[in-house]
Amino acid sequence: MSLPNTSSASEDKMCEGNRTAMASPQLLPLVVVLSSISLVTVGLNLLVLYAVRSERKLHTVGNLYIVSLSVADLIVGAVVMPMNILYLIMTKWSLGRPLCLFWLSMDYVASTASIFSVFILCIDRYRSVQQPLRYLRYRTKTRASATILGAWFLSFLWVIPILGWHHFTPLAPELREDKCETDFYNVTWFKIMTAIINFYLPTLLMLWFYVKIYKAVRRHCQHRQLTNGSLPTFLEIKLRSEDAKEGAKKPGKESPWGVQKRPSRDPTGGLDQKSTSEDPKVTSPTVFSQEGERETVTRPCFRLDVMQTQPVPEGDARGSKANDQTLSQPKMDEQSLSTCRRISETSEDQTLVDRQSFSRTTDSDTSIEPGLGKVKARSRSNSGLDYIKVTWKRLRSHSRQYVSGLHLNRERKAAKQLGCIMAAFILCWIPYFIFFMVIAFCNSCCSEPVHMFTIWLGYINSTLNPLIYPLCNENFKKTFKKILHIRS
């Protein structure tokens, strides 16, 4: 590619005498290889454009920048590469000045548009990661199309100096008809300025943007890991063994609601030692379960404050045998029970008993004072409401985490794709621009074979870009396989 003065023809002044040596029968294998690269570049970029057009999943705002990049790469493969190959095997330019200017214009415009397309793609990814909510309202196809048109407009500005340089500088040297070169091929200050604007400045900005993107994605991943640590994404399901069953038969260790009791406070503000649990992670009791192993579900729930009540006097109790497996015969009135179920705002891991086992409770397992029948029914009703509230909050939490996970995955995939595109772009173009800066100040340092190699290395970037998309994007990969009838 030829940002400033990339055409190999334009370097004849710097590498005089080398072109005749290159135009020999030994170039035939090289011409075959370069022609193959040109054909592959055209085919791959046409495949990208057809894939985006035919697959609805690829009709996204971000892929508009990919389309712009593919169009620029397609021009490089279909126009710039073939004419460069043609000029490579000729000892002199014999196609006329108009065709020469057309080739130079396409070379400069397409190569610059390719660079600018990568640049605006990087900006889009940066804003999507750094300002997701604000940029989401701004990120529309209309605005993306306007940005792309702006990049191409700036690229087409190359036509002005290519076609009209002699109008601005009357002292421009007279050009030979057998050479295809720009009027400013020997204007060092202009070439250096355009090299900085077209390559060095965008590259530095893209590297800065990508570092920011990488840090943001890494920060989001760490934040999500911390969030998942306090709010598990999935229910923790454990199979209770016989040991757990035997441990649940011990009196005083059970909660009829399947929720661990919090230590209640006495009127003086101290903790009631009777209600203090030894293990904060005690699982739900087995008093409501059937014989054998059962399944308990541990869910992050809201703490349930259970007020400590006075036990029923021994003379009022009925069914002493059942007392070992029931509520330890609490004597409660409706007012005290209404205060037994205060839900705390902070969430912690609690263990809820399986509601199905709760419904299978036998009469002997739940023998309570007859006067507490209404209280029992109301308590179950309150427990059901509490369970629904907790379940609803958990569903909302899972939904937020799911959406956040999808957004994070998109960020990571987009960052990976952009990183590959930038790496290929820099590796392909940095040799040319380094060599260009050297020969801009040292004409005798020019080597035509080296210069041609750096130019074609830049051209190959247009071949690599379409290969990067399916490697970094699953939708592109599936669409390519579908179009090419490749079975997974």
Curated annotation (Swiss-Prot):
Region (Important for agonist binding): 107-112, 425-429
GO cellular component, one term: plasma membrane
Membrane topology, Extracellular segments: 1-29, 90-97, 165-188, 442-447
Modification after translation (UniProt): Phosphorylation at sites in the second and third cytoplasmic loops independently contribute to agonist-induced receptor down-regulation.
Keyword set includes Transmembrane: yes
Residue ranges annotated as Cytoplasmic topological domain: 51-64, 124-144, 212-417, 471-488
Residue segments, region Disordered: 245-337
GO biological process: calcium ion import; cellular response to histamine; G protein-coupled receptor signaling pathway; manganese ion transmembrane transport; memory; positive regulation of vasoconstriction; regulation of synaptic plasticity; regulation of vascular permeability
Keywords attached to this entry: Biological rhythms, Cell membrane, Disulfide bond, G-protein coupled receptor, Glycoprotein, Membrane, Phosphoprotein, Receptor, Transducer, Transmembrane, Transmembrane helix
Record-listed Phosphoserine modification sites: S230, S344, S347, S381, S383, S397, S399
Membrane topology: Multi-pass membrane protein
PANTHER family cross-referenced by the UniProt entry: ADRENERGIC RECEPTOR-RELATED G-PROTEIN COUPLED RECEPTOR, HISTAMINE H1 RECEPTOR
Family per similarity comment: Belongs to the G-protein coupled receptor 1 family.
Protein name: Histamine H1 receptor
Organism: Mus musculus (Mouse)
